[in-house]
Amino acid sequence: MSSFPVLNVGFSNVVFVSKILTILLADSAGAKRLRTEAKSENRLIDATCGRKTRSVLVLESGHILLSAIRPESLSKRLETGDNHIGEGEEESED
């Protein structure tokens, strides 16, 4: 059986690493524009579970995925291959 590397984007939501094009800071102007366009075109995936959006992932399919995990944490998970949830990464609601 082959292995498919996945990235935990928070709250038990995962995405195939091979499908991720970029990870953006949610507060950037470009990310906000992508989010608005994707919502109007029904291409928006919200994986925040009601928390503040911190990262915007652009997927190969053209979908935009919202995550409550900081881009730095997601990048670290990608680099190390460790999907362990760090203390405080998902619990805070600020």
From Swiss-Prot:
Pfam family, one: RemA-like
Similarity comment: Belongs to the RemA family.
Protein name: Putative regulatory protein LEPBI_I0950
UniProt-listed InterPro entries: RemA-like (IPR007169)
Origin species: Leptospira biflexa serovar Patoc (strain Patoc 1 / ATCC 23582 / Paris)
